[in-house]
Amino acid sequence: MTDSTKQKGLEWQKQGLSDNERLKAESNFLRGTILDDLEDGLTGGFKGDNFQMIRFHGMYEQDDRDIRAERADEKLEARKFMLLRCRLPGGIIKPAQWIEIDKFARDNNYYQSIRLTNRQTFQYHGVPKTKLQEMHRLLHKLGLDSIATASDMNRNVLCSSNPVESELHQEAYEWAKKISEHLLPRTNGYLDVWIAGKKVQSSDSFLGQEDEPILGKTYLPRKYKTAVVLPPLNDVDMYGNDMNFVGIQDEAGKLVGFNVLVGGGLSFEHGNTKTYPNVALELGYIPVEQTLKAAECIVTTQRDFGNRADRKNARLRYTLQNMTLDGFREEVERRMGFKFESIRPFEFTERGDRIGWVKGIDDKWHLTCFIESGRITDKPGKPLMTGMLELAKVHTGDFRITANQNIIIANVAEEDKQRIEDIAREYGLIGNISKLRENSMSCVSFPTCPLAMAESERALPEFIDELDNIMAKHDVADDYIVTRITGCPNGCGRAMLAEIGLVGKAIGRYNLHLGGDRPGTRIPRMYKENITLPEILAELDGLIGRWAKERNSNEGFGDFVIRAGIIKPVVNAVVDFWDANLIPTVTA
């Protein structure tokens, strides 16, 4: 580590550490006093540090905000429950596992639903505290867990859900699993709390033998997201992750290495110009056999240099700002013991899922079902949850959750194809969906998310209905615009990589961002601030009308609004996300 690198990367050490750092240091390797709270029947939630500690075990405490005020008027505690997010690198799950997951959701979940996430896994909303150990023990029995799917760890690792290139996808999937396992915490805290139910005291001698060689005793400074992706399909929204491995093939189609890109992230804070979303930047190329070494050294560099004083500036993109990309690369190379090679050529052309049937190179069929906002539940006329259960009872392949919140019924034999399609159609898993809707996304937001400022999942269907009408009005109904709504600027709906991105500001009001692109390589800029959905639709009516008439051949909406001068592109978000007048001058 050079003196210049140290100086550029560690200025935050002059400030006091955030309280989360104390919490982690005193947690007995993430055990806390969670078991004591589980025995407390006076509250449906967790107290003190445990409110944060359960996040390391893949859970968040929430409540039903629709009835919060009503319960307060009645002098009742908010209806508290937990969100649990499963660890499922690459998103592959077996039908037998799904059957048990479905049963738990029906029997123990306030909302009787399963939510597919754009982190390529499933989560439960509305699990009462009294059912948490039962839930974790079920996952354990199924060979699953929820370790490190939240808080200051490497989250669920994404992987391209490419059902056509089966052999290459399998290789990429195996690497996603290896990366996930390699970067997991080594503590037995999760098993002690949730499976064994064993209380551990800080004085217990064996704690002195526990070690976290990669993550460290206080783990990472902030959340950390990783993806493995196979061009040309950017279905994992690679540019929004902290660490990305872009698969490179040789002439024979064999996976030979990865381009590594780092520092993507989509969260920011309204009005706080020290925060910004940004796309991942190119670090270099590595041969495939060096993948785990590179992943570890990138993570440990972030562990040691990431800001532990200000959590709003703790993600890897801010570390790059402090160290510079070259300084960060230098430190990673020092730890690896070898240098990155030059980036290999690659290109992304799209990122949506191939809805419907596709045939793989192994002659197996794969059915991708569109699930709006990833919500699998039974509604009148659309019993998706029962449909998935019926498919799980007969399907002999596997299910693949996609990073677009959809699900693939994968590895269907020719002779089983019609039966699978009949079930999917009967229960509404196949239907006539517009291209616009296929390329839409939302976060959960109300009523369960404590950070929600505006509706998202519940607003999306009607908003897309109205936008579909506008598309039809201008004779572009067969085309699409990547459209996303997120209920706050935390970024879960990935609106900061959309062509049209809505970011919740207050109840019924949003900031409208425009200018992302179809492959997902550009941050959209704010076009209008704090406006209502009807006002947004009126703005988009005029803009889509212009796009329909003035666009070049195959020009996406996001590219058009920039070329037409309607909005300026975000060139370097560190500098110009908040002020287009600061766009760096690009020289040829």
UniProtKB/Swiss-Prot annotation:
CC annotations in GO: sulfite reductase complex (NADPH)
> What does the entry comment about cofactor binding?
Binds 1 siroheme per subunit. Binds 1 [4Fe-4S] cluster per subunit.
| Catalytic activity as recorded in UniProt | hydrogen sulfide + 3 NADP(+) + 3 H2O = sulfite + 3 NADPH + 4 H(+)
An example Gene Ontology biological process = hydrogen sulfide biosynthetic process
Q: Which SUPFAM superfamilies match?
A: Nitrite and sulphite reductase 4Fe-4S domain-like, Nitrite/Sulfite reductase N-terminal domain-like
The UniProt record lists the EC number as 1.8.1.2
Show the GO MF annotations: 4 iron, 4 sulfur cluster binding; heme binding; metal ion binding; NADP binding; sulfite reductase (ferredoxin) activity; sulfite reductase (NADPH) activity
Record PANTHER family: SULFITE REDUCTASE [NADPH] SUBUNIT BETA (PTHR11493:SF47), SULFITE REDUCTASE [NADPH] SUBUNIT BETA-RELATED (PTHR11493)
Function as written in the Swiss-Prot or TrEMBL entry? Component of the sulfite reductase complex that catalyzes the 6-electron reduction of sulfite to sulfide. This is one of several activities required for the biosynthesis of L-cysteine from sulfate.
Q: How does it assemble?
A: Alpha(8)-beta(8). The alpha component is a flavoprotein, the beta component is a hemoprotein.
Q: What is this protein called?
A: Sulfite reductase [NADPH] hemoprotein beta-component
Give the originating organism: Actinobacillus succinogenes (strain ATCC 55618 / DSM 22257 / CCUG 43843 / 130Z)
Q: Which gene encodes it?
A: cysI
